[in-house]
Every structure is written in structure tokens, then in C-alpha cells.
Amino acid sequence: MRQWTIDAFATGPFRGNPACVLEPFDVWPADAWMQALAAENNQAETAYLLKTADPDRFGLRWFTPTLEAPLCGHATLAAAHVLFEELGVDVAMLSFETLSGVLTVRRADDQLEMDFPADPPRRTEIPEGLAEALGVRPREVWAGAYLVAVVDDETTVRQLRPDLGALKVIGGEATGGAGQTVVVAQADAGADYAVVSRFFAPGFGIPEDPATGSAHCILMPLFGDKLGAGRLKFHQAYPGRGGDLECENRGARVLLRGRGFTVMESQLRLEPARN
């Protein structure tokens, strides 16, 4: 069985966010096996695909090294990249059946465009301990699936060195649980993107994620309102890599656009365990 490593939301290899994607299965492997392989891969996400009777429709599940995720943008883009580019699936649009409903991906020039549910955040008080964990006091805090800490400027975002142990237990009013915080600011003048962010997810076993599609389901509604824009470019400033997304508000949905690059193809030397 083949597995690929794809750099998603990237401008080239060794950029963006790597995800592992398995060749599609006829039946789901055992959950424990999928979790064990995700831990072995030790990437932020490993994506598993399931064939259906329709050539353009697949089941899709995402596992971090420690648990199954309810939604993952970069691994969805990676899965679509594998189907389109590595396996030659010749359809106009892919549909994925997931824990977050049906997600669609289509080609958009040299990018892939994903249609995800919007997660408009609500303004909230600064949770106890958050400023200390981040090492900076946010100007504003918002809550969607993740906490969103708005800070003064891009330099603050880039220089942040949070206490991940302390951050892991802070959830505030976030619906996705503790230990998942986006730190964000408007970009510096002259940047070719409008918003810059970083995403820390020690609660999911991920100290920092290089490029996070699901976070932009929160950030696009938030900064679309702040900046009066229906479409924005975002940069996720993970040190040494960085991820780039174009996002568009579509009411209850958000369109996420980005590119994927295949950096590795490998062969598993074991058979998947079954439930």
C-alpha cells in the first residue's frame, strides 16, 4: 500500500504544512491501526480515504499523532492533491464524507479550492492565564472552534514564544476544547497578504501547526468583517516554513485556496488491521 507526503498550502516543497495520505481503502481499517500509523508518521495529520460507488466521492478521516480530528484543511487539500495528481482521478470536483459533513474540492487554475463550513467567532473575555501563556496581552480574544488572540502587529506574531504547557489547558469559550489558540494580526504595510497568524495546538498533540485550513474558517469571517473584504490573502508564519492561503466568504461557507506539492512516496510493508 502506498503513502504520500504532501506539502499543503505551500509555495513550493518544504513549505506549507506536510500531511501523509494513504492510498484509498475498500473498507476502513481499525481505528487503533489508523491511530498507530499516524503516531508512526508523526506528522500533524495523516489522512485516510475510503472508496465509494461514485468515482468522485470518498470517505475521509484525519488523525493527529494522538487523536482523530473532526476537521482538517491542509490534509483535505493533500488528499485531493493525491487523488488528482498521483492517482489521476479525472473529475471536475471531489466530494469527501467527513465528521464535519460533506466537503468539496475542485481545481482553481494552479490551486485547489475547498468549500468548508464557516465558523464565525464571538468576542469573549481574555481567559485566565492566556496572556501569561502567550507572553503578551491580546488586544481582543474571540472564540470559535479555537481561541483567537488578536495582537498588535506582525512582529508580535512572529516573535511569539508561548509556554505550551500552560497554553495546553486554556480553552476559554472555544468549542473545540482546550489547548488550541490562533495568534493573529493585520500584516505589515507592503506585505502581499492581509493577515498573518500562527496556530498553537498542544491540546491536540501539535506544538505549532505550519498551515491550518480550519483556523481560516474562523479568521476569514472575522477579518472579512474587520477589513470590509469578501476575499483575503493570509500567511501563517510558522518559523522556517510558512503557509499561504487565499480565502473567500460565502455566507455560511468559506472557500480556501492553496497549492500542494508531493515530496515523498513510500510503501507500507504491513497490512491494515480491521475492526
UniProtKB/Swiss-Prot annotation:
Biological processes annotated in GO: biosynthetic process
Keyword Disulfide bond among UniProt keywords: no
GO cellular component: cytoplasm
Keywords recorded for this protein, A-Z: Isomerase
Source superkingdom: Bacteria
Enzyme active site: 45
EC number(s) from the headed UniProt entry: 5.1.-.-
Single GO term (MF): isomerase activity
SUPFAM superfamilies in the record: Diaminopimelate epimerase-like
Cited Pfam families: PhzC-PhzF (PF02567)
InterPro entries per the UniProt record, alphabetical: Phenazine_PhzF-like
Family stated for the protein in its record: Belongs to the PhzF family.
PANTHER family, alphabetized: PHENAZINE BIOSYNTHESIS PROTEIN, PHENAZINE BIOSYNTHESIS-LIKE DOMAIN-CONTAINING PROTEIN
Protein name (Swiss-Prot/TrEMBL): Uncharacterized isomerase CC_3221
Organism: Caulobacter vibrioides (strain ATCC 19089 / CIP 103742 / CB 15)
Phylogenetic classification of the source organism: Bacteria, Pseudomonadati, Pseudomonadota, Alphaproteobacteria, Caulobacterales
